[in-house]
Amino acid sequence: MLIDKFGRPVTNLRISLTKECNLNCFYCHREGQQDGERTMTPEEIERIVRIASRLGIRNVKLTGGEPTVRPDIYEIIQRIRPYVVDLSMTTNGTTLYASAEKLKEAGLDRVNISLDTLDRKKYKMITGYDVLDQVLKGIRRATNLFYPVKLNMVVMRGINDDEIWDMIRFAGEVNAILQLIEIEVPREMENSQFFKDFFYPLKPLEEKFEKIAVEIRERKMHRRRKYFLPVDGKMVEVEVVRSMHNTTFCMNCTRLRLTADGYLKTCLLRKDDLIDILGPIRRGATDDELVKIFKRAVQLRKPYWIN
């Protein structure tokens, strides 16, 4: 197992398959990626995952952009499936109604679906597209095939902060887990107008959850809290993701990232941490040389928010 200088094990790999997306959400952080021309092939992705698995990284999440815009998404899943214990994907859900069964057959274990609002006009304002009904159909299809299904709601002040309880009820209705997520920006953007306008702190909401939850659990990843809330006769699982200035969150991060253009990246918010792995692969690097690249990336890891 790989362990960084801060004693944090690295067990998860988050792979961006593409920077392309069929939506245009105004707050998107693009997985912290910069512009790049290279695209990893299914064979190259498989090799990187195989090396990662050899080093004890056996939990993989596929992201984008929107990963399902890649026509070879099913091949990618099939290729990496043998090397991982848990294979999940974050998606905007626009293609799920048509693709969920094929994704399951290819070997995908579970999905996280971005859903910031249940209001059609708001959805179009946030994403640029009027496809909410299509996404909701995809969510219902997914909950019949995958378990668990998580709904990711980025809570934004003045936009959807009035829908939190509606979203909790919807999650209960479709038997999904709801993740409430604070907007996350690097230090240099904390004084930006964007952050001032839209950041909605979730700590007060967590304090309310603590009073009404039937059960509270804590995940190893980031020490996130999960609240089991009785709502409309159902037990709804709600997870709160608060990363801004959260040193506990950072000290319990077990994740390494792989950008769509083939760089290992240690932190979403950092810009000085890219380690090229695709270039060496294309220049004929051996497996042992790729192992050294992984180890070098892990030794670069450091908590972004730290006392």
UniProtKB/Swiss-Prot annotation:
<keyword id="KW-0004">4Fe-4S</keyword>
<feature type="binding site">
    <location>
        <position position="189"/>
    </location>
    <ligand>
        <name>S-adenosyl-L-methionine</name>
    </ligand>
</feature>
<dbReference type="GO" id="GO:0046872">
    <property type="term" value="F:metal ion binding"/>
</dbReference>
<feature type="binding site">
    <location>
        <position position="27"/>
    </location>
    <ligand>
        <name>S-adenosyl-L-methionine</name>
    </ligand>
</feature>
<feature type="binding site">
    <location>
        <position position="267"/>
    </location>
    <ligand>
        <name>[4Fe-4S] cluster 2</name>
    </ligand>
</feature>
<dbReference type="GO" id="GO:0051539">
    <property type="term" value="F:4 iron, 4 sulfur cluster binding"/>
</dbReference>
<dbReference type="Pfam" id="PF04055">
    <property type="entry name" value="Radical_SAM"/>
</dbReference>
<dbReference type="GO" id="GO:0006777">
    <property type="term" value="P:Mo-molybdopterin cofactor biosynthetic process"/>
</dbReference>
<protein>
    <recommendedName>
        <fullName>Probable GTP 3',8-cyclase</fullName>
        <ecNumber>4.1.99.22</ecNumber>
    </recommendedName>
</protein>
<feature type="binding site">
    <location>
        <position position="14"/>
    </location>
    <ligand>
        <name>GTP</name>
    </ligand>
</feature>
<feature type="binding site">
    <location>
        <position position="253"/>
    </location>
    <ligand>
        <name>[4Fe-4S] cluster 2</name>
    </ligand>
</feature>
<dbReference type="InterPro" id="IPR013485">
    <property type="entry name" value="MoaA_arc"/>
</dbReference>
<keyword id="KW-0501">Molybdenum cofactor biosynthesis</keyword>
<feature type="binding site">
    <location>
        <position position="90"/>
    </location>
    <ligand>
        <name>GTP</name>
    </ligand>
</feature>
<dbReference type="GO" id="GO:0061798">
    <property type="term" value="F:GTP 3',8'-cyclase activity"/>
</dbReference>
<dbReference type="InterPro" id="IPR010505">
    <property type="entry name" value="MoaA_twitch"/>
</dbReference>
<feature type="binding site">
    <location>
        <position position="65"/>
    </location>
    <ligand>
        <name>S-adenosyl-L-methionine</name>
    </ligand>
</feature>
<keyword id="KW-0342">GTP-binding</keyword>
<comment type="similarity">
    <text>Belongs to the radical SAM superfamily. MoaA family.</text>
</comment>
<keyword id="KW-0456">Lyase</keyword>
<dbReference type="InterPro" id="IPR050105">
    <property type="entry name" value="MoCo_biosynth_MoaA/MoaC"/>
</dbReference>
<feature type="domain" description="Radical SAM core">
    <location>
        <begin position="5"/>
        <end position="232"/>
    </location>
</feature>
<dbReference type="GO" id="GO:1904047">
    <property type="term" value="F:S-adenosyl-L-methionine binding"/>
</dbReference>
<keyword id="KW-0547">Nucleotide-binding</keyword>
<dbReference type="InterPro" id="IPR006638">
    <property type="entry name" value="Elp3/MiaA/NifB-like_rSAM"/>
</dbReference>
<dbReference type="GO" id="GO:0005525">
    <property type="term" value="F:GTP binding"/>
</dbReference>
<feature type="binding site">
    <location>
        <position position="21"/>
    </location>
    <ligand>
        <name>[4Fe-4S] cluster 1</name>
    </ligand>
</feature>
<feature type="binding site">
    <location>
        <position position="28"/>
    </location>
    <ligand>
        <name>[4Fe-4S] cluster 1</name>
    </ligand>
</feature>
<keyword id="KW-0408">Iron</keyword>
<feature type="binding site">
    <location>
        <begin position="255"/>
        <end position="257"/>
    </location>
    <ligand>
        <name>GTP</name>
    </ligand>
</feature>
<feature type="binding site">
    <location>
        <position position="61"/>
    </location>
    <ligand>
        <name>GTP</name>
    </ligand>
</feature>
<feature type="binding site">
    <location>
        <position position="114"/>
    </location>
    <ligand>
        <name>S-adenosyl-L-methionine</name>
    </ligand>
</feature>
<feature type="binding site">
    <location>
        <position position="150"/>
    </location>
    <ligand>
        <name>GTP</name>
    </ligand>
</feature>
<comment type="function">
    <text>Catalyzes the cyclization of GTP to (8S)-3',8-cyclo-7,8-dihydroguanosine 5'-triphosphate.</text>
</comment>
<keyword id="KW-0949">S-adenosyl-L-methionine</keyword>
<keyword id="KW-0411">Iron-sulfur</keyword>
<feature type="binding site">
    <location>
        <position position="25"/>
    </location>
    <ligand>
        <name>[4Fe-4S] cluster 1</name>
    </ligand>
</feature>
<dbReference type="InterPro" id="IPR000385">
    <property type="entry name" value="MoaA_NifB_PqqE_Fe-S-bd_CS"/>
</dbReference>
<comment type="pathway">
    <text>Cofactor biosynthesis; molybdopterin biosynthesis.</text>
</comment>
<dbReference type="InterPro" id="IPR013785">
    <property type="entry name" value="Aldolase_TIM"/>
</dbReference>
<dbReference type="Pfam" id="PF13353">
    <property type="entry name" value="Fer4_12"/>
</dbReference>
<keyword id="KW-0479">Metal-binding</keyword>
